[in-house]
C-alpha cells in the first residue's frame, strides 16, 4: 500500500470504531483474533445492504425464493460436498517470525508489486507459474517460486521458509450429551449446502419450475490460519448466496447473464466502474466448470467481493450418491430436438455468492471522505460518509435549534410522526454545527432543524449531507421528501 492508501484504510478502521460501526469482539479481554462485532450503526448499515440484496435477488424475481437453513448439518453433508477431504489452503511458515501465511497470497502480493512497478512481464510470468502450480497442487513448486522471487516475511524480513503444507479450514465440534458417544459435527464453512439439501423440498412445496433460484443470507465459519486486513478475512462471517438451478446445456448462457446482472447491482450504488473488475479463476474449485470473481480495488489492492460459479451438477449428484435419495427434477417441457419431454435429470447450478462483510467494508471505503472546508478566515474540515441514502443507518436527524421555547416539543412531535417509517435520530446537545458534523460522520442524508419560525408557519430547515445546502420546507412535506430520498426504487428500477 502507498502511504495515502495505507492512511485511508487506517482512517476508515479508526472511524468505524469511533462512530459505532465495528468493534473488536471481546475487546475488554484484549479481543479475539479475526472476530468482530457490528455496533449500532454498523448493524443498521449491514442490514440495509442485506435488504438491498434480498429485494434485488428475491423480490424482483418471480422464480427466486429465499430460505434460512441451519448452521449445523449432518456431517455426511460435508463429506459429500468435498469439504472434509478438499477444503484446505496452502500454508507456509517463516521460521524466524513464527508467522504463517497463505503461499498463494504471498505470491499474489508480489505480482501486485510487480504490476505497480511497471514490471508487467514479470507479473504475468509469475501469475502463470503460480496458476500452474495451484492447478497441479504442486506445493514444492509454490515454495520454489517464493524463494526465486525473493519474497521475505513482512515481519522478520527473512526468507527462512518451511515447506508449503495444506490446512483444512473447517471448525469441528461435538453434538451429544456424553463426550465419548458424541457425533462430530461442523460449523458450516459455506451456506450453499443448506440450499442444495433443501432444493427438492423448495421445488415441490413451491411448485417451482426450472430455471429457478434459492437465496439465503447466513453465517459461515472458517478456521482461517491467516486472518488479516480488518473484516476482509474473518473466522466468522456472513454470506449472501443464491443458487440458480438450470437445465443441463444452458449453464453457459445463465452464467453470463448472472455475471452481468451482479456487476450492475454493485454499480447501481454509484461506485465508479473502474473500481471493479472481473477475475477469471484458473484453478477451479472441485465443483466448478467456470468461475469469475467480481473484485473491488481496496486500498490494499483488488480483492474478491462476489463470486459467480458454474457448479455443474456436482453438489446435487454428490448428495444423491451419499444420501441414497433421488435429487432429480422432472422437466415436462418438450425438447424441440426430440419432441419429447426433457424428463428426469439433475439440474446444473449457477451460484452467486457475496461476502457481506467485504461488501460492508467496500461501502465504508467508498463513502469515506475527509473534506477541507477552510476559508481565508478560519480552518475547517469534516469527515463524511457519503452513503447511498437507502443504505444510510440513520435516514434523518431532527434537531431543535435550542433546548427551550417549545422547540424540543415540536421537534419530538415531528419525530413521532415520522419514526414509524424511517430510522431517525433526535439530538439537542451542542451547537447546531457540531450536530451536523456528527451526522455527517455516520452518513445521515439530511438533518431537519426546528426553530422559532417553525412554531409560526410549520416550516423547517433541511440541510443536505453531501452539498451542505439548506432549504426551507413545510413540515407536512417531510414524509414525502424522506420517502422519495430513501425509496428502494432509486436502486432497483
Identify the role of each PLM range.
Residues 1-493:
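NTP/phosphate- and nucleic-acid-binding module
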Amino acid at each position: 500500500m502507498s502511504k495515502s492508501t495505507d492512511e485511508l484504510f487506517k482512517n476508515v478502521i479508526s472511524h468505524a470504531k469511533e462512530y459505532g460501526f465495528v468493534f473488536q469482539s471481546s475487546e475488554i479481554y484484549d479481543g479475539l483474533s479475526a472476530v468482530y462485532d457490528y455496533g449500532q450503526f454498523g448493524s443498521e448499515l449491514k442490514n440495509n445492504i442485506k435488504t438491498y440484496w434480498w429485494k434485488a435477488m428475491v423480490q424482483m424475481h418471480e422464480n427466486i425464493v429465499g430460505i434460512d437453513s441451519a448452521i449445523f448439518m449432518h456431517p455426511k453433508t460435508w463429506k459429500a460436498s468435498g469439504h472434509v477431504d478438499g477444503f484446505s489452503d496452502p500454508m507456509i511458515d517463516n521460521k524466524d517470525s513464527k508467522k504463517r501465511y497463505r503461499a498463494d497470497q504471498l505470491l499474489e502480493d508480489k505480482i501486485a508489486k510487480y504490476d505497480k512497478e511497471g514490471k508487467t512481464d514479470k507479473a504475468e510470468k509469475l501469475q502463470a507459474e503460480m496458476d500452474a502450480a495451484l492447478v497441479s497442487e504442486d506445493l514444492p513448486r509454490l515454495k520454489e517460486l517464493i524463494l526465486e522471487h525473493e519474497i521475505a516475511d513482512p515481519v522478520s524480513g527473512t526468507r527462512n521458509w518451511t515447506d508449503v503444507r495444506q490446512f483444512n479450514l473447517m471448525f469441528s465440534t461435538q453434538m451429544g450429551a456424553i463426550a465419548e458417544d458424541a457425533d462430530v459435527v461442523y460449523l458450516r464453512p459455506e451456506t450453499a449446502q443448506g440450499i442444495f439439501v433443501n432444493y427438492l423440498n423448495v421445488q415441490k412445496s413451491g411448485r417451482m419450475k426450472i430455471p429457478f433460484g434459492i437465496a439465503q443470507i447466513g453465517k459461515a465459519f472458517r478456521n482461517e490460519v491467516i486472518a488479516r486486513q480488518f473484516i476482509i478475512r474473518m473466522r466468522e462471517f456472513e454470506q449472501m448466496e443464491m443458487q440458480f438451478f438450470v437445465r443441463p446445456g444452458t449453464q453457459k448462457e445463465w452464467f453470463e447473464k448472472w455475471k452481468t446482472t451482479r456487476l450492475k447491482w454493485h454499480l447501481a450504488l454509484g461506485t465508479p466502474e473502474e473500481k471493479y473488475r472481473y477475475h477469471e479463476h484458473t484453478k477451479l474449485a472441485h465443483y466448478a466448470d467456470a468461475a469469475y470473481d467480481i473484485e473491488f480495488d481496496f486500498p490494499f489492492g483488488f480483492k474478491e467481493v462476489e463470486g459467480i460459479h458454474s457448479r455443474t451438477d456436482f453438489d446435487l449428484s454428490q448428495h444423491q450418491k451419499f444420501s441414497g435419495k433421488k435429487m432429480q427434477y422432472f422437466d415436462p417441457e418438450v425438447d424441440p430436438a426430440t419432441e419429447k419431454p426433457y424428463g428426469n435429470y439433475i439440474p446444473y447450478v449457477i451460484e452467486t455468492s457475496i461476502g457481506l462483510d467485504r461488501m460492508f467494508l467496500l461501502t465504508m471505503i467508498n463513502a469515506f471522505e475527509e473534506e477541507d472546508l477552510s476559508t481565508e478566515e478560519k480552518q475547517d474540515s469534516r469527515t463524511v460518509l457519503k452513503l447511498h441514502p437507502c443504505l444510510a443507518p440513520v435516514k434523518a436527524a431532527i434537531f431543535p435549534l435550542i433546548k427551550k421555547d417549545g422547540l424540543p416539543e415540536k421537534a419530538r412531535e415531528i419525530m413521532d410522526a415520522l419514526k414509524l417509517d424511517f430510522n431517525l435520530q433526535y439530538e439537542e446537545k451542542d451547537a447546531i454545527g457540531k450536530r451536523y458534523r456528527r451526522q455527517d460522520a455516520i452518513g445521515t442524508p439530511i438533518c431537519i432543524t426546528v426553530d422559532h419560525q417553525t412554531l409560526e408557519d410549520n416550516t423547517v430547515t433541511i440541510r443536505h449531507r453531501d452539498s451542505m445546502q439548506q432549504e426551507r420546507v413545510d413540515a407536512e412535506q417531510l414524509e414525502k421528501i424522506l420517502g422519495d430520498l430513501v425509496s428502494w426504487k432509486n436502486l432497483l428500477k
